[in-house]
Amino acid sequence: MPAAAGAAAAAAPAVDASVTPTPAGAVPIDGAAATGASVPAESAGATLVAGASTAPASAVAAPIEAPAAVAAAPADVTPAVGVSTTSASSKAASIDAVVVGATAAAAAAAVSSADTTPTPGAAPTPSIPAPTDASILAPADLDAAVTRATDALLAAQQPDGHWVYELEADSTIPAEYVLLVHYLGETPNLELERKIARYLRRVQLPGGGWPLFTDGAPDVSASVKAYFALKMIGDDADAEHMVRARNAIHAMGGAEMSNVFTRIQLALFGVVPWFAVPMMPVEIMLLPQWFPFHLSKVSYWARTVTVPLLVLNAKRPLAKNPRGVRVDELFVAPPVNAGLLPRAGHQSPAWFACFRVLDGLLRLTDGLFPRYTRERAIRQAVQFVDERLNGEDGLGAIYPAMANSVMMYAALGYPEDHPNRAIARRSLEKLLVIHDDETDEAYCQPCLSPVWDTSLAAHALLETGEPRAEAAAIRGLDWLRPLQILDVRGDWISRRPDVRPGGWAFQYANPHYPDVDDTAVVALAMDRVAKLANTDVYRDAIARAREWVVGMQSSDGGWGAFEPENTHHYLNSIPFSDHGALLDPPTADVSGRCLSMLAQLGETTGNSPPARFALDYLLAEQEPDGSWYGRWGMNYIYGTWSALGALNAAGLPFDDPRVKRAAQWLLSIQNPDGGWGEDGNSYKLDYRGYERATSTASQTAWALLGLMAAGEVEHPAVARGIAWLAAEQREHGLWDETRFTATGFPRVFYLRYHGYRKFFPLWALARYRNLRRSGTRRVTVGM
């Protein structure tokens, strides 16, 4: 899912763990590498420690040449740019001037009005400055912006045709990696630890704690893990930054306020007793599918993370921890007295009370389970992991599950050179990003995102209409084609046993867990190329993708990220689910892309029941203020873009009240500088309406794409947004974006896709150019 995949990543390990699934190995190179321009510090010299698919930076730096067969395509082929273009010569035509900016007085007035608290459920009052005293963006400048961004994106394409960018989460994943090495008693790579320590210190807040997203509030669990990792690496507990961290943790109630996954980590190191961890007996593995707690009733990410944890809970091993590091000083009271956490805000009081009683009963009876039953349950858990180990791409292709599988094998006495333990351990190294540039840092990714990155980059390039860009997009899709999962019936068969496989995973390989969102986006791109080049080379792939996506539709008409009907909401009230991320219910963003796919493939709400049900679901999910919730991207801007693209593809007229309300909402939240922004605070349980945040390139692009899907290409606010993107573009052709704009698990785990600021702005600029040149308001593709 853009996230969708991203999703899986952090889930189970929730609060601190990762989010999106993806394994693999490649070298994320910033698009500027081949242009001769300066490369952003954050990605220059970054190396993904990965496997065979990794290419040396030098191999990626050269611009991609269009394959001769594609470059020589017939001149009368219409570029798949999302709108009807007129002729090849029209690409040289000038476009109307783009209005940029506003007077200082108008901007000040807008800022003043923006401070007004919005009425709950109502669209915020528009506060967009009028386009007075404007400067003009010449048509040639817009063309140049598209060209520079295209150059940068092409330069980042891997030799085999795909794209993969860094996927950054918060401090918890690199901290957990450090702790894992010492848990296993391995000899640490001191240079790597030094770089990770630099990263952890840099993302520490001035107040001492660590946040879940840029400029966010300190999070006690993230802070405990980061402090523990730094102390394990060798930072003096009396160092200024460590004292600040300790004080911040105490101010949040101490380490005893940590979430379940942090408590498990502390229990493994002997800091807290296992009593502080909710009971999760391994005998769960033996329950029948109809049972309320069967594993098929939770999400894929929760399943892959939890199964090895069940074994750890049964074995309760103690970390080797050769340096003997402890963090008792982070507790307000003695850690040995740590009890269970109270009910979380998302949990039902009644259900939680029932489950807390059950937790107590399980503690009383834990020693009474027959030994042979426990051993049988452990064997079943190991079998589950073995079957899904996924080679060097790892269990579930997400860090938490992969790390837990390594610890499980170690707890069961598997030697380091046992094939399963060894390959599980190697899979973690492929998630490392090591910067050898001036930043001199390293961190561990929650997963890898090559399928997501490649499919979205292809869409952006197709939008430009340039032959070289289209050729590169085709190379990317040709790389994707053999990755379609056609012969593995994954865990989704528990709900849809008669559906044939046909999806794509989020990562390089994850055959048991294809991703609905990725599959829809890949099929959309392949269909664009099929129409552009008048080819049927992707016909079978698209047909199987459509068949599988329709098979994954839930009974309410929507789609979850990985499986249908994953809506057993009572499970998020068990003590183990303080993170609230056990489930994968249908969401508007994923459902919007599935409807977009069906509509682009020619299905209408009149001739296709799946499309009709999807439209009904999407319209029912619209918020009172006109927006849609964004599960995998941050947040309502992302969800609203996803929904508007689908409504346009489904043929809703621009004057439909639902479309107009959504467009008005986007217009009303534009920042005075012309961009759009939103942060993780929008996921809080007491959210009452949009809260302004710093403009970002990716969110501005989403808002613009949404407005253009709503027929608002001529609106002055769109011109201001386009001008903002053009003004923020750097010499290397890309955009700077340090803020997190994606979501692994709301309120728990957020993501920063380094590719988002590269392909989404290009996509928006190119679409704007296409619509203005063609003189039409209607976008003719699904995304």
Which residue ranges define each predicted feature?
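Intrinsic disorder/low-complexity segments
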Residues: G6, G36, P40-T47, A62, ...
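Alpha-helical polar/charged "hotspots" used for coordination or helix-helix interfaces
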Residues: A10-A11, V15-D16, G25, G31, ...
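Conserved positions within tandem-repeat grammars
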Residues: P21, A26-V27, A41, G51-A52, ...
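Preference for long, amphipathic alpha-helical scaffolds in soluble/luminal domains
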Residues: M1-D16, T20, G25, D30, ...
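Intrinsic, low-complexity polybasic segments
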Residues: A46, G51-A52, A62, A102, ...
